[in-house]
Regions:
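GST-like domain detector, emphasizing the conserved glutathione-binding G-site
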Residues: 1-128, 132
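Short beta-strand edge/turn micro-motifs at domain boundaries
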Residues: 20, 200-201
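GST-like fold's C-terminal all-alpha helical module
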Residues: 101-199
Length: 203
């Protein structure tokens, strides 16, 4: 297998790298430099017609894209430690939280990135007022998440899971582009310190 991705702070390839470290797996990796538009080159589009990373090339020559889908595939091959849950309830809870983080927090951070950051100015027509309007949305979500984390150690409960990987990469990407955790969200800050202290956090 070979993993095609990009260096930090790109959040989606990093999800898979963290997952691999948590699983104790080693996979050949190849960088796809996004700033050079390598992900839009015809050779890469043969691997993923959407021109996005990460992409996992399987031993049979086929390709998987989308970070969560790649990690689900790897979990199927290497079930332990279970990062998608070991019971139907745990699996559903982790899925719920993955969806919540992606839809409620990653979405506004992505809008801020695409519509306000200088690095994306040449890639699309930026609507800066729209981008800035998403800061209030992100702030509300951070405060909601802070309340949820008041009673549990990790995003989906008392065990570290794929939901924590999604949240960590999302929040740290937000920090890198100027969307910090609000100062009064102490539970989110404490949670991030816990996951950032894991060996996988350097991936």
């Amino acid at each position: 297998m070979k993993l095609y991705g990009e260096d930090n702070p790109a959040p989606n390839p990093r999800r898979v790298r963290i997952f691999l470290v948590e699983k104790g797996l080693t996979v050949e990796q190849e960088r796809v430099p996004l700033r050079e538009r390598a992900h839009k080159a015809s050779q890469f589009l043969e691997k993923n017609s959407l021109g996005q990373v990460p992409v996992l090339e399987l031993d049979d020559g086929s390709f998987l894209s989308e970070s969560v889908s790649i990690c689900r595939y790897l979990e199927g091959l290497h079930p332990e430690p279970r990062l998608f849950g070991s019971t139907p309830k745990a699996q559903a809870t982790i899925d719920m939280w993955i969806r919540r983080i992606e839809l409620q927090l990653m979405a506004p951070i992505a809008h801020i990135w695409r519509h306000t950051h200088p690095l994306t100015a040449g890639l699309l027509t930026q609507y800066k007022d729209f981008g800035e309007s998403n800061r209030a949305h992100a702030d509300r979500v951070f405060h909601w998440l802070d309340t949820e984390l008041a009673g549990q150690a990790f995003i989906a409960g008392e065990a570290y899971s794929m939901a924590d990987i999604i949240a960590q990469t999302t929040i740290e990407f937000g920090q890198a582009i100027g969307v910090p955790i609000p100062e009064d969200c102490g539970h989110v800050t404490a949670w991030l310190a816990r996951v950032a202290g894991r060996p996988s956090a350097t991936a």
